[in-house]
Amino acid sequence: MAKVSVVSLHKESRRTESNKYKGYPFLANGEKNDYPTMIELLVGGSATAKACAGVIADFIYGKGFSLEAEARATARQQRTRFRKDTLYINDKRETPNDLLKKVARSLSYHRGVFVQVNYNQLFQKTSVQVLPYRYCRLGARDSNNYRGKVLYYENWDNLQDKKEVDKNVKAIDLYDPSPKVIQEQVDAAGGWDNYKGQVYFLNLDRNDSYPLAWADVVLLDCESEMLSTKYTRNGFKKGFFGTYAFVTSTMNSDEDREDFRDNLRNSIGVEAEQSVFHFELEMKGDKLEDQVLVKPIESNVKADLFEYADKKTANNIRKTYGNIPPVLIDFVEGKLGNTSGDSLKEARIFMQEQMQEERQDVQEMFEELFDNFAEPISSNGLFEIMTNY
């Protein structure tokens, strides 16, 4: 797993790397070019951030595209089986709804998504699929101030030998459906068999580089919540919280000392090793309690302070995700209790309005991507996302 660290926001930079892969310099994403991976690790490790990302994805996806629901309804009315294969949009047997789920998830973590489009020799689109966000980097601008490439590589966080990277990096053209442009790209690639299609990049920040994630300003809070969970887990796993001192009489030899410490490790488990200290003292008495003493070392982490910090951290995270109402996070985590149906409904309506712009961006992207598709998916060219209210 890649090793990442939280970055100071004032030091965060988007820069063009001097290294060229496939002949193209690229725009690094983050101070160490590991920003997307860092986001996925920290959001995935924070219960609140992960729940918030799930809420964002749900309200972008809604109930899916109306065209797919209508096709299913028509099949039911005709008392025939719904032929899902009529909506397949790539060789992964995905439908527009399947693609929408992946788009929503990428946007819920990164506020951006990369989508690959392939063409046939009639310049019709033949397949559309989402690329993993963390594998994609924008190419640098050329002498004409044009950014024409996306570099695709599956291990940006662990760059190896430059020649090895260069061999595995894929340079894919940015989206431009003009037949003239496509033909020029095909010729440059050495023919249709070598052509990799194009990549559409939806950036919710609408800037000239990469968007900042929803969790960007609360990365430290995400890390704190992740560490809090780990602290609690380790406490239960090893059977006690805090740090302890084991005091014994002086060992007769190094061998006796190592045997004692090995037995101690085996009894408390590897997870607790760093929470136990062994001290040797001249102790009097023949009884066991006179020879071995176990003393807790007082921790400055108080339960009430711990609870306050956890709540404050969770609230900070929630606010950065469009100020998601707490009731929706409780719903995701199964903690609704006596929450009224009205408050849940109001919260859903609020989030539906909050995500209206994002859904509109996604609808327009789909309408663009499936324009001139070889097998028409939408009879009127529209891709309307159904909402809950």
Give the positions of each predicted feature:
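Extended, non-catalytic structural segments that build the interaction scaffolds
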Residues: 30-47, 247-256, 285-316, 338-358, ...
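Structured, contiguous alpha/beta core segments that scaffold functional sites
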Residues: 2-50, 54, 58-64, 80-284
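Short coil/turn segments at secondary-structure boundaries
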Residues: 115-119, 239, 328-334, 380-384
